[in-house]
Swiss-Prot record:
Stretches with biased composition (Basic and acidic residues): 257-270
ZnF segments: C2H2-type: 280-304, 310-334, 340-362
Lineage: superkingdom: Eukaryota
GO MF annotation terms: DNA-binding transcription factor activity; DNA-binding transcription factor activity, RNA polymerase II-specific; RNA polymerase II cis-regulatory region sequence-specific DNA binding; transcription cis-regulatory region binding; zinc ion binding
GO biological process, one term: regulation of transcription by RNA polymerase II
PANTHER family, per the entry: KRUEPPEL-LIKE FACTOR 17, KRUEPPEL-LIKE TRANSCRIPTION FACTOR
Protein localization: Nucleus
Family from the record: Belongs to the Sp1 C2H2-type zinc-finger protein family.
Keywords, alphabetical: Activator, DNA-binding, Metal-binding, Nucleus, Repeat, Repressor, Transcription, Transcription regulation, Zinc, Zinc-finger
Biased composition (Polar residues): 30-46
Protein's UniProt name: Krueppel-like factor 17
Length: 387
């Protein structure tokens, strides 16, 4: 206590002004909405001149922890927690996100660069009840304004930075005490210290799109080459463990395969449709047939004219044919000449197509060594004798 008193005597601040600043820094405005609105707890420190300079000493930090622990624990049970400075000086908020695929921890350091912006000195990941779920506390800093609806929006675009306030609430331990240093701070992990405020405000809305939605199946992040991740990749990775590829939607590149299949199908179709050269066309009306040989065209034209030059010379036979091969098959009926013989049963046929049709019957039924038994099986069972 004596060392704390000596530390207090070293600061050129009046006692009554120091007490007034301490009480104002520890005052909280609790705003608890209904469960349907997401359970938002808002707290800010108002003062006549914005954020004041508070001496950093161990005794004051213990007092701040003791006095702010009770309201913060009740606020954490309601859901996400926002810590805000006055709207005219800026806004800093800490949304809480939960990832089930892999535990990710955001760690952020601050460096003084520009005035008029709220600041936090680090955020820690708080464990939850389930061992497989990790709570991630993310700290953003920038010039923001608070509309009447309650969502922080960026001044140039008016896009809400937190669009998933209605997430399921989970209790966690209170965040560490946030000491105000008086100087404005900006994050040096997400953005370059020399980056102008307009680029800072342009990057923050893109970070809000990476927050998960209610439905775990809708969890998706922009690809690695997207413009929203370029400033993050330039400063290094901010995740302790990489997210597995199972959490990202699988993109199947089927377009080249489909194009290749279509080209192959077209080639096959063109191969079928490309006929052999048929220079001999039938000139009769509504016919349009073509042939590779002139003899085939002549025999075809005989069907149009009705001419049958090939006549059977067998006695008492009046058959005539368009082609000579047809006449030769017909004469075998009279001579009983059957040149085509089955090698399994010994039957003979006048035409080769009749032999092939007969050989299919042997494939459908078991082979019999006796040709007569085979012929009797084809004829059918014998009738039973009458007793």
């Amino acid at each position: 206590m004596e060392q704390g008193a000596e530390g207090l005597s070293q600061w050129p601040v009046a006692p009554h002004q120091f007490t007034e600043d301490t009480e104002k820094s520890l005052s909280f405005l609790d705003m608890s909405s209904s469960p349907g609105s997401g359970g938002v707890h808002t707290s800010w420190n108002r003062g006549p001149s914005g954020i004041r300079r508070v001496p950093q000493c161990p005794e004051l930090e213990r007092m701040s922890l003791a006095s702010a622990q009770a309201p913060r624990q009740s606020a954490c049970e309601m859901g996400q927690q926002f810590s805000m400075s006055p709207p005219e000086h800026g806004l800093s908020y800490c949304p809480q996100m939960t990832f089930t695929a892999s535990q990710m921890v955001y760690s952020q350091g601050m460096s003084p660069s520009q005035p008029g912006m709220g600041a936090f000195k680090g955020a820690q990941a708080m464990p939850l009840g389930e061992p497989s779920i990790s709570s991630v506390a993310v700290t953003f800093s920038g010039n923001l304004r608070m509309p009447p609806s309650g969502l922080p929006v960026s001044p140039p675009s008016g896009i809400p930075l937190m669009s998933h306030i209605g997430m399921p609430t989970m209790p966690y331990s209170g965040l560490p005490t946030v000491p105000f240093n008086g100087d404005a701070l900006t994050p040096n992990m997400f953005l370059d210290p020399t980056m102008p405020p307009t680029e800072v405000q342009a990057v923050l809305p893109s970070l809000a799109q990476m927050l998960p939605s209610r439905d775990p199946q809708d969890f998706a992040m922009p690809p690695a080459g997207s413009p929203s991740l370029l400033p993050l990749e330039s400063q290094g990775s901010f995740l302790s463990q990489p997210v597995s590829q199972e959490d990202f939607p699988k993109h199947h590149l089927c377009e080249p395969r489909r194009e290749a299949q279509n080209s192959r199908a077209q080639e096959r179709a063109s191969g079928r449709s490309s006929p052999v050269s048929r220079p001999y066309h039938c000139e009769y009306e509504n016919c349009g047939k073509a042939y590779t040989k002139r003899s085939h065209l002549v025999s075809h034209q005989r069907k149009h004219t009705g001419e049958r030059p090939y006549k059977c010379t067998w006695e008492a036979c009046t058959w005539s044919f368009f082609r000579s091969d047809e006449l030769g098959r017909h004469t075998r009926i009279h001579t009983r000449y059957r040149p085509h013989k089955c090698d399994q049963c010994g039957r003979q046929f006048m035409r080769s197509d009749h032999l092939r049709q007969h050989q299919r019957t042997h494939m459908r039924m078991p082979r019999s060594p006796d040709p007569q038994a085979d012929s009797g099986r084809r004829a059918g069972p014998l009738p039973a004798p009458h007793l």
